Amino acid sequence: MKRQALAAMIASLFALAACGGEPAAQAPAETPAAAAEAASSAAQTAAETPSGELPVIDAVTTHAPEVPPAIDRDYPAKVRVKMETVEKTMTMEDGVEYRYWTFDGDVPGRMIRVREGDTVEVEFSNNPSSTVPHNVDFHAATGQGGGAAATFTAPGRTSTFSFKALQPGLYIYHCAVAPVGMHIANGMYGLILVEPKEGLPKVDKEFYIVQGDFYTKGKKGAQGLQPFDMDKAVAEQPEYVVFNGHVGAIAGDNALKAKAGETVRMYVGNGGPNLVSSFHVIGEIFDKVYVEGGKLINENVQSTIVPAGGSAIVEFKVDIPGSYTLVDHSIFRAFNKGALGQLKVEGAENPEIMTQKLSDTAYAGNGAAPAASAPAASAPAASASEKSVY
């Protein structure tokens, strides 16, 4: 009898548990690894969305040194980009003209800004006045020739192709019609930024700068319309090395501008076709360098290498006012071939960071007391290109 009662009691307890008399066990909390895997899966699903189902957006592109606005969406889109190749005569420097081959009428071509996972649809037109076919090789594209074959376009024709921006970074695009070096040397290059899905940190000012080397028949400064010199190009002996296609393109009245206390980001490219750039801003230290436009970040950098056909992103805070000179620190290129730019910064002086000259006394020899102050001797006259540098 006792055994029957015990069995009945156990059975009733199991019945109560089955009917919810006991609280249900909670599912284990999601681990960070599981959350990351779920996020990755969601991103992969978005990346695999057929391009025909994506929202369509017309790209906002900009001429240098302006930069398109940051991406403010959290989903992929089909981004339509229109490009036109134009061959035109423009000023290389005062009194010197050159027949440039361009994307959209200037050197560099327009800057393009898209988001990782976007499908980029390119409508590529070659102006009827062009003398040769042109195309575009996007270093941001994965696939045959970066789109060069798909965009090979005769004068007066338009071609269309698309690619998916699979990997974030800052990439060069350039013409790749033979002779490739000649097309690039005449100015056919630009930058496309593929923002990571999470975006880039906010900064106060952004600028677009591309270095290039030019090969004219005449020496630097020789007046008139200067033709391209293939022999100099093959020998890698440029007469001009410049930022944004022209001597003084970002100097003097065209200088970049910022205010003390602002953080500046520069998207720096090197169209080449031959030279590697040693990019430096005199009087500044780069807080961050996105090495070769990729994911790796170096900090506290004085100068950074920008390879031909490559790029870098540099960021720095301008603490005090002044005129900061941008150079290729292969320094004869700066002072003798044109690779000079300016960032003019306004604001209040801060002597805690740097003072003006505090004294000027006559040299008295090692260990001797300073001699009486005397008027400073006149310095040798600076060349026109050096007057605003230091």
Curated annotation (Swiss-Prot):
For this protein, what reaction is catalysed? nitric oxide + Fe(III)-[cytochrome c] + H2O = Fe(II)-[cytochrome c] + nitrite + 2 H(+)
Is ATP-binding a UniProt keyword of this protein? no
Q: Where does Cu cation 1 bind?
A: H134, C175, H183, M188
Any one GO molecular function term: oxidoreductase activity
Where found, per UniProt?
Cell outer membrane
* Renumbered residue ranges of the record's region Disordered: 30-51, 367-390
Positions binding substrate in this chain are H139, H280
- Composition bias of kind Low complexity appears in 368-390
What residues bind Cu cation 2, as annotated? H139, H174, H329
Any one Gene Ontology biological process term? cellular response to iron ion
Q: What's the top EC group for this one?
A: oxidoreductase
Task: Report whether Lipoprotein shows up as a keyword of the record.
Answer: yes
Covalent lipidation (N-palmitoyl cysteine), chain numbering: C19
Q: Which GO terms describe its cellular component?
A: cell outer membrane
> Family per UniProt?
Belongs to the multicopper oxidase family.
Q: Indicate what this protein is called per its UniProt record.
A: Copper-containing nitrite reductase
Q: What is the protein's species of origin?
A: Neisseria meningitidis serogroup B (strain ATCC BAA-335 / MC58)
- Name of the coding gene: aniA
